[in-house]
């Protein structure tokens, strides 16, 4: 008995020894009593594969992040009430342990409303279909379900001892999400709801602080935080709450038909440096890796399958240079200043014209920022006896208040130019061979046969429970020969919120309609021939992601809302027959999905591309549909929806883990509107060339991401002009041959590092101009 007690005591002491105390004061998050500068990045586990997670998280750490932040996706984990899924890339615990194994912290945003451009904001549609349900307010049914899911997630994480208070990586947890943006629409019920959220979260006793983002009135002890492109002017609602930024948008999401969003590297860096200049101490990038909206997870509506987000890591996990490298350099500088930023006394010097210097002073030393918020005018100032040139819309950082170590507008990191290459698998045929199987729709077109029947037009979510993008609405109309609506000039008029609509009368396709993004309520009308006797009307409603944002967004309709009319015209007379209360039959989905034809071995087969570079499938020539690789749903495709030459891409991510490295691979396509698959092909994506434009007294680092540098296309030290791919020599140039030096130092190597100085490249008579080394290398 004595021996057993001793063993139990040792276990308890050992467990407690590894616990981390996470708290906060008005200056910073504290870890084991020490104030910390914390830099975090969002990586959503379902938007990549389990095989990608270690590399993505490792690159986050190598980018000098401290933490990885993720949402928890309710509808992915509980697609059917009380039936849970944590398999594959939904294995939240495995993801959190991967973060832990890399020695990083975790930030767990449970929500469980997530927005995130995710289908229905992460809410399961069965929740909407519960009687009397209202989302995100003091609705008993909603609060019960939210508490059930939140508690389940917390208990799962506790069981694996993953909160910092248990020795795990999670230092912060989040309840709700951006509710402050919509709280006004809910009145007093909204205020009561957010108080309930705080009380419920606090009762779960996770042992780390809870945060609420975009919630100015977040109840204590919740920490309110900021989301946006810039949060330097944000002020917490409590003097004991540190200044925290949970979403620094590194780019933006993409809509079908839209252009690729882009946020400059310089602007992201400026926003971060400005935030820390103005007393911020926790910052998270949304996104650090965006990834892919596999299957039907994209929300919106009209959010694309790619969720690249112009993040520091691209959709495939490649370094998005120069964004990744320029931010890493910023992180290193901020970490080096951690003590002065979190403990120093703060003073500010105003130079006018939107230029300020901020000094953080401790007994050991000082660190300084010089910020120029003027968007057009560079600044030349004298600060503490030294002259500094600060470009417009930039921040210079002086860790010792003397030497400028970093400026947000001066990029010294390489730019990587990514290229796509054809599949070079051994013995791969130049074209794919295809087999075809048509979708069997006779039962719905000619018989109007469905799974359920009601005398009402229902919202698609109610009938389909979001089990499919596709819902058939069918009715049979008996017209007598003397019916006044019958005639030569007839049409079918449909009031609809379907994102895409196909209409059939008596088995004939009379037309289709695709809505413009944002204009989801419309009237479709098309000429149609009706006959005396029975006429079968079949409408196929298609959704392209359910709404994920807004007050009461659960009430945004999808499908055939009605009314539906047969219109007859006889001279100047218009006769209208309302079919809205007819007997309507409903059928969810398509037979090919139900019969799992996507797992068939009969469609096109091909060999996996050689090597380890990311793989894409180019679906140019196709219309709209869904694609599967070896039974894995890689998401919706819609190359036919091109707004202009800068619009949607026809290339879709195929994770390497979906491929068979030996033997054949199977591609299955469901093509909805028709297309030509002869152009479909597989490609790999890798670094084709790298460029750099590095200021003197910095280090040039070139890397071809595991491939050798094969040639130096351009090199000049002085004041070269142009951009990557079009560099040209300037008015002054160093005496030594820069191209020859770089050829000797770099060609044949996977990476190289060179000091940019006159000692290396020779004198350049450039006067007062800042000297730079411009390089373009071929990989």
Swiss-Prot record:
Xref: InterPro entries: BetaGal_gal-bd (IPR048913), Galactose-bd-like_sf (IPR008979), GHD (IPR041392), Gly_Hdrlase_35_cat (IPR031330), Glyco_hydro_35_CS (IPR019801), Glycoside_Hdrlase_35 (IPR001944), Glycoside_hydrolase_SF (IPR017853), Lectin_gal-bd_dom (IPR000922)
Entry-listed glycosylation sites: 148, 248, 345, 374, 489, 495, 555
Expression sites by tissue: Ubiquitous, with higher levels in roots and siliques.
Compartments reported by the entry: Secreted, Extracellular space, Apoplast
GO CC annotation, single: apoplast
Sample GO molecular function, one term: beta-galactosidase activity
This protein's UniProt keywords: Apoplast, Glycoprotein, Glycosidase, Hydrolase, Secreted, Signal
Enzymatic class: hydrolase
Entry-linked Pfam families: BetaGal_gal-bd (PF21467), GHD (PF17834), Glyco_hydro_35 (PF01301), SUEL_Lectin (PF02140)
Enzyme Commission number: 3.2.1.23
BP GO terms, sorted: carbohydrate metabolic process
Signal peptide: 1-19
Active-site residues from the entry: 178, 247
Reaction(s) this enzyme catalyzes, per UniProt: Hydrolysis of terminal non-reducing beta-D-galactose residues in beta-D-galactosides
Domain SUEL-type lectin: 694-779
UniProt record similarity statement: Belongs to the glycosyl hydrolase 35 family.
Name of the featured protein: Beta-galactosidase 15
Natural source organism: Arabidopsis thaliana
């Amino acid at each position: 008995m004595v021996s057993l007690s001793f063993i139990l005591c040792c276990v308890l002491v050992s467990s407690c020894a590894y616990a981390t105390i996470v708290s906060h004061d008005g200056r910073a998050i504290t870890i084991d009593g020490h104030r910390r500068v914390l830099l975090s990045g969002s990586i959503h586990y379902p938007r990549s594969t389990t095989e990608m997670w270690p590399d993505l998280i490792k690159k986050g750490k190598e980018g000098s992040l401290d933490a990885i932040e993720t949402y928890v996706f309710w509808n992915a984990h509980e697609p059917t009430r009380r039936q849970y899924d944590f398999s594959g890339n939904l294995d939240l615990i495995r993801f959190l342990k991967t973060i832990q194994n890399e020695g990083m912290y975790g930030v767990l945003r449970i929500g469980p409303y997530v927005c995130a451009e995710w289908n229905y904001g992460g809410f399961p549609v069965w929740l909407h279909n519960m009687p009397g349900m209202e989302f995100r307010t003091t609705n008993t049914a909603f609060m019960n379900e939210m508490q059930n899911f939140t508690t389940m997630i917390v208990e799962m994480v506790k069981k694996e001892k993953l909160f910092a208070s248990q020795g795990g990586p999670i230092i912060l947890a989040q309840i709700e999400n951006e509710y402050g943006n919509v709280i006004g629409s809910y009145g007093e019920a909204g205020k009561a709801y957010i108080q309930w959220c705080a009380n419920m979260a606090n009762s779960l006793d996770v042992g780390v602080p809870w945060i609420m983002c975009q919630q100015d009135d977040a109840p204590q002890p919740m920490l309110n935080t900021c989301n946006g492109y810039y949060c330097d002017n944000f002020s917490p609602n409590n003097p004991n709450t540190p200044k925290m930024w949970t979403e620094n948008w590194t780019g933006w999401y993409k809509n079908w038909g839209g252009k690729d969003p882009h946020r400059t590297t310089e602007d992201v860096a400026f926003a971060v440096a400005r935030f820390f200049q103005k007393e911020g101490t926790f910052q998270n990038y949304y996104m650090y890796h965006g990834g892919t909206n596999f299957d039907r997870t994209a929300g919106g509506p009209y959010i694309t399958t790619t969720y690249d987000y112009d993040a520091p890591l691209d959709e495939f996990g490649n370094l998005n240079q120069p964004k990744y490298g320029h931010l890493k350099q910023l992180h290193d500088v901020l970490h080096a200043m951690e003590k002065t930023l979190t403990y120093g006394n703060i003073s500010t010097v105003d130079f006018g014209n939107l230029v300020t210097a901020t000094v953080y002073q401790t007994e050991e030393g000082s660190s300084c920022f010089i910020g120029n918020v003027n968007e057009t005018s560079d600044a030349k100032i004298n600060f503490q006896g030294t002259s500094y040139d600060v470009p417009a819309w930039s921040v210079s950082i002086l860790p010792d208040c003397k030497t400028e170590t970093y400026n947000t507008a001066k990029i010294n990191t390489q730019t990587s130019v990514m290229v796509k290459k054809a599949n070079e698998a051994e013995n791969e045929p130049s074209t794919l061979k295809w087999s075809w199987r048509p979708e069997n729709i006779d039962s719905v077109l000619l018989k109007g046969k469905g799974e359920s029947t009601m005398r009402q037009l229902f919202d698609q979510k109610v009938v389909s429970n979001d089990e499919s993008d596709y819902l058939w609405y069918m009715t049979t109309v008996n017209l007598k020969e003397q019916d006044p609506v019958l005639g030569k000039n007839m049409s079918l008029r449909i009031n609809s919120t379907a994102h895409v609509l196909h209409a059939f009368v008596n088995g004939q396709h009379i037309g289709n309609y695709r809505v413009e993004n944002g204009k989801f309520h419309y009237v479709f009308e098309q000429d149609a021939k009706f006959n005396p006797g029975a006429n079968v009307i079949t409408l196929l409603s298609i959704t392209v992601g359910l709404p994920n944002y807004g007050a009461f967004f659960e009430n945004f309709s999808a499908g055939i809302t009605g009314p539906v009319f047969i219109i007859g015209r006889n001279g100047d007379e218009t006769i209208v027959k309302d079919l809205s209360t007819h007997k309507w039959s409903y059928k969810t989905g398509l037979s090919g999905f139900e019969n799992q034809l996507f797992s068939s071995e009969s469609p096109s087969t091909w060999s996996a591309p050689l090597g380890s570079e990311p793989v894409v499938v180019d679906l140019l020539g196709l219309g709209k549909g869904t694609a599967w690789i070896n039974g894995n749903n890689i998401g919706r495709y819609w190359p036919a929806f091109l707004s202009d030459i800068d619009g949607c891409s026809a290339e879709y991510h195929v994770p390497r883990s979906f491929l068979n490295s030996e033997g054949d691979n199977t591609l299955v396509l469901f093509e909805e509107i028709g297309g030509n698959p002869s152009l479909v092909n597989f490609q790999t994506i890798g670094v084709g060339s790298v460029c750099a434009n590095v200021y003197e007294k910095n280090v040039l680092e070139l890397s071809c991401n595991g491939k050798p540098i094969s040639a130096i296309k351009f090199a000049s030290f002085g004041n070269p002009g142009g951009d990557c791919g079009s560099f040209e020599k300037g008015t002054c140039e160093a005496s030594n041959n820069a191209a020859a030096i770089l050829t000797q130092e770099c060609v044949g190597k996977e990476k190289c590092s060179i000091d940019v100085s006159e000692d290396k490249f020779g004198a350049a008579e450039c006067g007062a101009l800042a000297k730079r080394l411009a390089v373009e290398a071929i990989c």
